[in-house]
Curated annotation (Swiss-Prot):
Catalytic activity of the protein: uridine(34) in tRNA + AH2 + O2 = 5-hydroxyuridine(34) in tRNA + A + H2O
GO BP of this protein: tRNA modification
Species, as recorded: Variovorax paradoxus (strain S110)
Protein name: tRNA uridine(34) hydroxylase
Domain of life from the UniProt record: Bacteria
Active site location: 183
Length: 263
């Protein structure tokens, strides 16, 4: 029986009270018996939490009571057991490290494409303007190895800070194409899409909600394998079930993705 509700969410929004907010969120999460990781930075919030459904939803409702997070969108999945080992709330320079301070998603984001539209484009082999689709995987190499979109571009980066120089080396590859950046839940592809537009690449979109939202809305069409996740479930299938529910992969201790977690 799938009793544990897992949520992933992020929002780029200015936060100037991180130390106080950290204690508040930690106390509330612990009181509700939740486990997982919350990252706070001046640029926003990034969280992965799991617990009993009522407890998770109570926490999210409390978070949305803060005007900064009123429109926070969550992605849900279920598991038979708690995939995290403890509850962590961390303060970071960035909620997803890129080491590119000029990229400020809270000040404006690149346009997005939703899952049904992307599936339709992939079905027909081009976007609505007739341009070829270039799917760009912005995740780390070991995540890509678990599964990705068919024909997606994979630069074999080992951490997200390698994305900017990789982009400079390959920017000419995107001429005349519609580029769709994607990642697990949307956070990395949001920064990646902004950087590509600032580098002068035209027709750049980000996959809204990432792979997990795509799975939720259209399943595994044009996708092979599973989606790596940074918790004890290891990976999620296109039906959002855990492929390795009993795997011994460690629970996420730093979803900043800079720890070099290996399979």
């Amino acid at each position: 029986m799938q009793e544990i509700l897992n949520i992933a969410a992020y929002k780029f929004v200015a936060i100037d009270d991180s130390p106080v907010l950290r204690e508040d969120l930690r106390e509330r999460a612990q009181a509700l018996g939740l486990m997982g990781t919350i990252l706070l930075a001046p640029e926003g919030i990034n969280l992965f939490l799991a617990g009993l459904p009522d407890a998770v939803r109570s926490f999210v409702a409390g978070l949305r009571a803060d005007v900064r997070f009123a429109d926070l969108e969550t992605k849900e999945s279920w598991s038979a057991a708690q995939p995290f080992r403890r509850m962590l709330v961390k303060l970071k320079r960035e909620i997803i490290r890129m080491d590119h301070p000029a990229i400020q998603p809270a000040a404006g984001r690149a346009p997005g494409v939703d899952a049904p539209t992307l599936k339709r484009w992939l079905d027909q082999g081009h976007d609505d303007e007739g341009r070829e689709i270039a799917l760009l995987d912005t995740r780390n190499d070991f995540e890509v190895d678990e599964g990705s979109f068919d024909g997606a571009i994979d630069w074999r980066i080992t951490k997200f800070t390698e994305f900017p120089p990789a982009l400079k080396a390959h920017r000419a590859d995107f001429a005349g194409k519609t580029v769709v950046s994607f990642c697990t839940g949307g956070i990395r592809c949001e920064k990646a899409a902004i950087l590509m537009r600032e580098e002068g690449i035209e027709n750049v979109l980000q996959l809204e909600g990432g792979i997990l939202k795509y799975f939720e809305e259209v399943g595994g069409a044009h996708y092979h394998g599973d989606c790596f996740v940074f918790d004890g479930r290891r990976a999620l299938a296109p039906d959002l079930s855990a492929r390795a529910a009993d795997a011994s992969a460690r629970a996420a201790e730093d979803v900043g993705l800079s720890s070099g977690l290996k399979k």
